[in-house]
Amino acid sequence: MTKITLFPHNFRIQKQETTPLKEKSTEKNSLAKSILAVKNHFIKLNSKLSERFISHKNTESSATHFHRGSASEGRAVLTNKVVKNFMLQTLHDIDIRGSASKDPAYASQTREAILSAVYSKYKDQYCNLLISKGIDIAPFLKEIGEAAQNAGLPGATKNDVFTPSGAGANPFITPLITSAYSKYPHMFTSQHQKASFNIYAEKIIMTEVVPLFNECAMPTPQQFQQILENIANKYIPNTP
């Protein structure tokens, strides 16, 4: 499966070796400007992190106040909203669009990973359904493989069935869920809540990446999903 680097590398300031006293003034000025630039970067970064921390603290305080004075259903709705807002902010911090606009290779890998994840999800879902009804899945696998190949996904053909090389889980869901779980572990105690947050993570990711498909021949995730569903419907009986 294609691997995608989600977060930028950390900056590291290395110790500068002592230079002769007769160093050219231009070199001194260049070094001073470099140090100042790095210093300013960390000042801005620290300011942004502080603002975000204060924002989350205020939001949590509001949620706690509501929790003490309202019914359990209302508490759950508000708290779920806080967690989802945190996940949305985490997605913005990953900055998929920004990274893709600067790096065509990253954009291509992202598109392939997203469509491969859609393929994997619906392949498993419909294969399980067809098997439960005693229907041979071979024709279905062959046809969705052709759809994946036509969508521009790289892969390999084995036993006359094409399989995308990057087939697997959506690589962006894990960072969102992991970050939210680390901050709000008490909100992930039930399978229902976990499933709800996973669905939300997938939804906002799919919306976020749509612009990456606007200027290429590949279908959007939503279009590819519809293609797979249409294929599956040909093999699923109308009667339960």
Swiss-Prot record:
Its main location: secreted. It is found in: Secreted. The keyword Ribosomal protein does not apply. The keyword Nucleus does not apply. It comes from the Bacteria. GO terms for molecular function: GTPase activator activity; guanyl-nucleotide exchange factor activity. Keywords: GTPase activation, Guanine-nucleotide releasing factor, Secreted, Virulence. Residues 78-240 are annotated as: GEF catalytic domain. GO terms for biological process: actin cytoskeleton organization. GO terms for cellular component: extracellular region. SUPFAM superfamilies: SopE-like GEF domain. Activator for both CDC42 and RAC1 by directly engaging these Rho GTPases and acting as potent guanine nucleotide exchange factor (GEF). This activation results in actin cytoskeleton rearrangements and stimulates membrane ruffling, promoting bacterial entry into non-phagocytic cells. Belongs to the GEF (guanine exchange factor) SopE family. Encoded within a lambda-like prophage region with similarity to GIFSY phages. This is Guanine nucleotide exchange factor SopE. It comes from Salmonella gallinarum. The lineage of its organism: Bacteria, Pseudomonadati, Pseudomonadota, Gammaproteobacteria, Enterobacterales.
